[in-house]
A protein has these predicted regions:
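ABC transporter nucleotide-binding domain
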Residues: 166-224
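Conserved ABC transporter NBD signature motif
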Residues: 56-67, 71
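Helix-to-loop junction immediately C-terminal to a conserved catalytic motif
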Residues: 48
């Protein structure tokens, strides 16, 4: 379980995240929804331990996450613009990641590359944006990390690829209890995969509830 308790973060005296409290249950898909600038990326970076909250606490399965390698081993963070080593190919990334994540699923990794049509020896910097996002997702899924943090991960993927990734998510959740946390500005994009959503606006949580409960509400909530 991921617990955020009253976390706050500012940049240049402007609050990007303001007193946010959210609980993310294991083996569910949690959608963090909000317009650009709502604070989604900042929240994910604090969960990943990249940024430290000015106030509040974040715990991963009861462990504080910032500067805590035991907690960070449970996480894999995919940024909006995924980072890869200069001039690397997919094989280079696999060799590096298995040194960080000992349970990295090597065979699955290469099978996914074939299924998604990604050349393992081609330089990643020659991939399209969508191909880089596919590779980042494959790396995250195969890492064996319990919590997969995805920042606008489905943006740039065509519908067929999105459906393929969603199917893999479902399989990994059933097989090993993986818990995806997906930040997006588009609720409609996630409504067929998320179990629970948190709506962010101007750095604060407007709403956090099960998606089915939200659908039953008479009021239609839409993020544009």
């Amino acid at each position: 379980m991921i617990e955020l308790r009253n976390i706050t973060k500012s940049f240049d005296k402007m609050k990007a995240v303001d007193n946010v409290s959210v609980t993310i249950r294991e083996n569910t898909v949690f959608g963090l929804i909000g317009t650009n600038g709502a604070g989604k990326s900042t929240v994910l970076r604090m969960i990943a331990g990249v940024l430290e909250p000015e106030q509040g606490e974040i715990a991963i399965d009861g462990l504080p996450v910032f500067d805590n390698m035991d907690a960070k081993k449970k996480l894999y963070f995919i940024a909006d613009e995924p980072y890869f080593f200069a001039n690397c190919n997919a094989v280079d990334m696999q060799k590096y990641l298995i040194s960080v994540y000992p349970e990295f699923a090597v065979e699955d990794f290469y099978n996914y590359l074939v299924n998604f049509g990604l050349d393992k020896k081609r330089k990643v910097n020659t991939y399209s944006k969508g191909m880089r996002k596919q590779l980042a997702l494959i790396c995250g899924i195969c890492s064996g990390a319990k919590y997969l943090l995805c920042d606008e991960t489905f943006d740039g993927l065509d519908p067929v690829m999105r459906q393929g990734i969603k199917s893999i998510f479902a399989s990994e959740m059933e097989r090993r209890g993986m818990t995806p946390v997906i930040a997006s500005h588009n609720l409609r994009e996630l409504e067929d995969i998320c179990d629970h959503v948190g709506l962010l606006h101007k750095g604060g949580v407007l709403l956090s509830k099960d998606l089915e409960d939200m659908k039953c509400n008479i009021q239609k909530i839409q993020c544009v």
